Amino acid sequence: MISCAEQRSRQGEAGRGPAPVAPAFLPIWLPRGCSGILSVPAVAMHSAGPPRAESSMSRQEKDAELDRRIVALRKKNQALLRRYQEIQEDRRQAEQGGMAVTTPALLRPDGLTVTISQVPGEKRVVSRNWARGTCGPGVMNEMVEDEDAEDHGGTFCLGELVELAVTMENKAEAKRIVSEKPTRARNQGTEGSPGGRMTRSPPTQVAISSDSAWKGAWEPRRSRPMGEPPEAGWDYAQWKQEREQIDLARLARHRDAQGDWRRPWDLDKAKPTLQDCSQLRGEGPARAGSRRGPRSHRKLQPPPLLPDGEGRGGQASRPSVAPATGSKARGKERLTGRARRWDMKEDKEELESQEGSQSTRETPSEEEQAQKQSGMEQGRLGSAPAASPALASPEGPKGESAASTASSVPCSPQEPDLTPLDLSLGGAGIPGPRESTCVLSLRPGAQESPVSWPEGSEQQPLGWNDHQAELEVQTCPEPQSGTGLPEPREDRSGKAGAQQGLAPRSRPPRGGSQRSRGTAGVRHRTGRPGPAGRC
């Protein structure tokens, strides 16, 4: 055990030592007799030689490392300063070059020029400079020479100049110029300076390229003579030619040596043939008037004609449309498919409604028919001399036309002219068998005329329809007898009335055919055999 005195003596010796290092104290637990905690320096346990050498070496290493860091920082600062100076110099030269290309007299003062330059090795920097430029021809000549010597391309000098200098972290230097110019041609030019030739450009120009490509793009424009005005379609023609070359090259890449498509999804494309080329050549004028181009040839063909010269549904066929001028069709001619069928259906309904209105206008009412029938029956029951005027009394002109029709119906094509039918009854003094009129009745019905018309002869429509009365003239042989009127046959009139009630009203056929409907059926008997029915 170490006593308290020995500990104090050791502390004194350690405190008188030459080592400047601050002593490190170690806590030691003391016995019960000594109260408190004593700290013993850790340096007293080691010799004084090795700590001095280690401290000196650490100082030298630290100083050397600090010197190296300072040198590196100085080099970096110098590089940054040098780069900043180069950037400022380049920007100043670009501003001078842009102001010295052209004079503001050639361009409008409200034009706009944007220059975006990329300098290698610097981050993106955008600066906007507004300047009013007044340049002389001498300065222009100097700047054009500097432009040829250096790698900087010139910009346009306008009334108000707006420059955007943008530098990117890449190795290529590029400039972007966006200029808005008036559309009218500028015939003026500076004859003394070659820089004036650079002012000839389209109204709006956007160019993004490197310096070498920038200079190469301006060479053909500089080669133009001074007095010649700029060509209107020069830029467009050049652009069109370039685009065609690019398209041809792309198609060549997509095909192999045999001319087949390389990609599997292009196999369904048909190869162009001579017929297709001729069709495309013929469709050229049609495509000029319509953006969508002409319709297919199948839709342009008119509907096929039926043997009777009518279209579908009894409607007259539409005029044919030329295949090459399909885009000029207007109105209903442009309808196809379901719309065309619906339009034809509407036209058919309109035609039927017109025919129905005409038939209602021409057809007398049922009351008039009843009056005519009653009048004819009264005239038939009267005296014999009154029988002949009974044909004209009920109806007037229509009755006369009916009688003339009944008399003018030909029995054979060889004998078209026949004597009028004698409706009067002869006296008793005339011997021999005679023919007398048995029944005169008006019968409305839609029955066809029993008279057979010869082929080649055209039927003349009489203007009567289904509900118009038919004049039926029936002649029966009468035996020779004395004077006296024949008794009217009421049974025949009853049969006619029953037949009138049972006869259905037939619907007129569709289409405007020349067949007459509702003509008077005339049955008569003459001395010679004819096509008419017999009693």
From Swiss-Prot:
It comes from the Eukaryota. Residues 175-233, 263-535 are annotated as: Disordered. Residues 383-394, 509-518 have a biased composition (Low complexity). Residues 289-300 have a biased composition (Basic residues). InterPro entries: DUF4594 (IPR029336). PANTHER family: COILED-COIL DOMAIN CONTAINING PROTEIN 9 (PTHR15635), COILED-COIL DOMAIN-CONTAINING PROTEIN 9B (PTHR15635:SF10). This is Coiled-coil domain-containing protein 9B.
